[in-house]
């Protein structure tokens, strides 16, 4: 009867009360139990007061109670009914697991995106290279065309130069035909000399007998005339005094070019006249004058040094890009492309 009474009494007590009674019977304090179980004193107090901390999972709470029961020598089977009430098991909320296929699909999508990015990059690089090649090829073709034009102009100029002697030979005929009157004049002057030399001393009679008037004319015609310079009719003699000769003033719009390598060049003034168009060889130079502004087209800007109005012209922007230089030199020496 006493055993059944104690059993009923134990069932009437809660889990926390039974653990507290057992602890007091063993003479242990809450601090000692907390140190042995490696728990906080507040946790031991909550267990004895049958409280379930909100921040503590039921699984951990049931484990702490079992450890406390073993410490105070209480069978765990006797505490199971109370554990179900004090620390009921809660259904854990399981987060939905992500399917592996979703990650695989995302990875596949990332792969397609990366492939598309590389494809766009290759297309941009290819288009840039094609554009550069077309520009370079167009410049080379333009230089070749300009060189062909200059060679054609040079050949036409050479043909015209070969036909010039024919014209000069015909123009020299009047000069040759006009010389006899000059000789006639000299003979006329010579025929007048006897009258001038009449007061001279007498000559040997034998010499006068030998020389006839016709022979005298022949001798005087054979002797060179004292006046050797013949000028055309109506032309004034050129001055020989060097002090009177004045040098022309330097043109302020003069264009001076020095060449360090072979270069094709075309220079046009404001009137549209081509001052020069053709190839210039290495170590050559040009000094051109015309009406400003000048329009220049240079095949190799790095091969020429230009001075306009005594100042150098900057061609660095054309040299860096390695392209045909097209610029205009205004009167105030401001080159513009």
From Swiss-Prot:
Transmembrane segments: 112-132
MF terms (GO), sorted A to Z: DNA binding
Keyword DNA-binding in record: yes
Cell compartment(s), UniProt: Cell inner membrane
Biased composition (Low complexity): 168-207
SMART domains xref list: HTH_XRE
CC terms in the record's Gene Ontology section: plasma membrane
Residues covered by the HTH cro/C1-type domain: 19-71
Gene Ontology BP, a term: regulation of cell shape
DNA-binding region(s), residue ranges: 30-49
Periplasmic side: 133-337
Pfam families for this protein: HTH_25 (PF13413), RodZ_C (PF13464)
Source taxon at top rank: Bacteria
Segments for region (Disordered): 145-220
UniProt topology in membrane: Single-pass type II membrane protein
Key words of the record: Cell inner membrane, Cell membrane, Cell shape, DNA-binding, Membrane, Signal-anchor, Transmembrane, Transmembrane helix
Keyword Nucleotide-binding applies: no
Topological domains annotated Cytoplasmic: 1-111
Positions with biased composition (Polar residues): 145-167, 208-218
Known function: Cytoskeletal protein that is involved in cell-shape control through regulation of the length of the long axis.
Family that this chain belongs to: Belongs to the RodZ family.
This protein's domain notes: The helix-turn-helix (HTH) motif in the cytoplasmic domain of the N-terminus is involved in the formation of spirals to maintain the rigid rod shape. As this protein is anchored in the cytoplasmic membrane, the HTH motif may contribute to protein-protein interactions to form the RodZ helix, which is localized beneath the cytoplasmic membrane. The C-terminal domain may be critical for determination of the rod shape by probably interacting with enzymes required for synthesis of the peptidoglycan layer, including PBPs in the periplasm.
Name used for this protein in its record: Cytoskeleton protein RodZ
Native organism: Escherichia coli O17:K52:H18 (strain UMN026 / ExPEC)
